[in-house]
Regions:
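N-terminal nucleophile
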Residues: 1-269
Length: 269
């Protein structure tokens, strides 16, 4: 499983997660990408003249974070990413709110989840996730949780409405309900402490983090000072010699945050 955290603060929505994938019983790999940006595009109706280019009515980048089955999460992620870039709407009829977009995603989620849970994976094939974005209809920042219970009943619920945060995954049961969660760093500290707690086997690896500002979700790498300086994006240390040794190689252009003041300076969050 995992721990994913969504919270609303400073006119933004933040998503964070660990990197651990549960492969089988007592078998883990800290290589999952659980926080990601998901571009979407909604096109105007097709023009009668097929040679005319389609106009884009709405577009942006949603944020997503996953918990649960690695197989289910991957299939949902791949399927949804493929179709969200070419949606179409009918003016006056189609719901182009963020809820409408999430209801479209929810249809794919149910279909894929049912098929995965029919296999030998059974209940272990269950996955849950959160999607956040700026609503095309209202320009408000909103977030929705996609979940499945033990009876394979699927739910779509808006979150970050009555509460400023939402915890998702097996790690949620270990969060101290009395924890003081005020700053962005407080949420990341909860995640870091759980990753460092070896008694919580389902949560581990490196922190992943992204922020939704206006209509754009940006994923950041994490700077860590531990046996040297590391610049993590999931399991990948992007500034390591492995990636930086050849002058002719492409390098990562991702931005990084230093949430725990590794170098004694203010963090980006």
């Amino acid at each position: 499983m995992t721990l994913c955290i969504a919270w609303k603060q400073d006119n933004a929505i933040h998503l964070a997660a660990d990197s651990r994938l549960t492969i089988a019983t007592n078998s883990y790999a800290d290589v999952g990408i659980k926080v990601l940006a998901l571009p979407y595009r909604i096109l105007q109706p097709a023009h009668p003249d097929p040679s005319r280019a389609r106009n884009v009515a709405y577009q942006g980048r949603l944020g997503m974070c996953f918990a649960g089955s690695a197989v289910n999460s991957l299939m949902i992620k791949e399927s949804v990413a493929a179709v969200l870039q070419d949606l179409q709407y009918a003016p006056g009829y189609t719901d182009v709110s963020l809820k409408g977009i999430c209801e479209f995603i929810f249809k794919a989620y149910k279909l894929i989840s049912i098929e995965i849970c029919k296999t030998a994976a059974g209940p272990k094939g269950i996955a849950s996730f959160i999607v956040c974005g700026q609503c095309p209809s209202t320009s408000l920042l909103r977030a929705f949780k996609f979940s499945t219970n033990s009876n394979n009943v699927h739910s779509l619920d808006e979150v970050l409405v009555s509460s400023n945060h939402e915890f998702l995954g097996s790690g949620a049961a270990h969060v101290d309900p009395k924890a003081a969660l005020v700053r962005n760093r407080d949420y990341l500290s909860v995640l870091r402490d759980m990753i460092d707690d070896e008694s919580i086997e389902s949560v581990g690896g490196n922190i992943q983090y992204g922020t939704l500002h206006n209509n754009d979700f940006t994923v950041y790498g994490i700077i860590e000072f531990k046996d040297g300086v590391h610049h993590w994006r999931g399991a990948l240390d992007m500034n390591s010699d492995y990636f930086m040794s050849a002058q002719s190689d492409l390098i990562s252009g991702i931005s990084y945050i230093d949430p725990f003041n590794t170098f004694g300076r203010s963090s980006a969050v």
